[in-house]
């Protein structure tokens, strides 16, 4: 493979402002949506809940629960009883004050891997030009995994997230201002904003 990225989008649903993503998927939207409107257009306006797991004999499995998407009863993963899901609406509302102040505009959002990863990306209003005249945009990314072993990740990135690979590149980048919160902790939006 010589370090090349495999072009796999794994997009379940998405919405985007601006240029059509390379895979041609998603609903095109205007760049003036509120975070909640973007969530709805990206069709990630669903919730998750933990549900007990039982054996065929009716015995409850200790210390484990199914993480279920309530809109269609899809089991997203099996997690521990101390795992705290973050609802998509809470993730999108993280952007509300920045969008309302005019500092950012919602840019892309969606669901990957059948709902196991949800992301929201806002474009920061200020960009800059490189010496050759190329404009560099900056984005603010919120990735909300509904998957055991993955942390909530909030960061600034120069990468426009539109698929699994661009999300992976953003999350693997070093040097970006970022905050990770594990699902065994409570997510406190104001603390994350302070830490950024």
Task: Please give the residue ranges for each predicted region.
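Intrinsic disorder/low-complexity polar-acidic segments
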Residues: 93-94, 100-196
């Amino acid at each position: 493979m010589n370090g090349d990225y495999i072009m796999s989008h794994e997009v379940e649903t998405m919405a985007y402002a601006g240029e059509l993503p390379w895979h041609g998927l998603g609903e095109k939207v205007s760049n003036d949506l509120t975070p909640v409107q973007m969530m709805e257009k990206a069709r990630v306006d669903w919730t998750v809940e933990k549900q007990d797991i039982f054996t065929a004999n009716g015995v409850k499995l200790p210390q484990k629960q199914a993480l279920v998407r309530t809109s269609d009863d899809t089991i997203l993963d099996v997690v521990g009883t101390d795992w705290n899901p973050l609802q998509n609406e809470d993730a999108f509302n993280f952007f509300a004050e920045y969008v309302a102040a005019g500092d950012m505009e919602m840019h892309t959002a969606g669901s990957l891997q059948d709902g196991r990863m949800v992301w929201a990306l806002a474009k920061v209003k200020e960009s800059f030009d490189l010496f050759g005249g190329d404009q560099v945009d900056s984005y603010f990314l919120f990735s909300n995994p509904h998957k055991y072993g993955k942390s909530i990740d909030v960061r600034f990135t120069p990468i426009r997230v539109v698929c699994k690979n661009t999300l992976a590149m953003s999350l693997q980048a070093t040097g970006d201002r970022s905050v990770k919160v594990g699902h065994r902790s409570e997510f406190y939006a104001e603390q994350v904003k302070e830490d950024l």
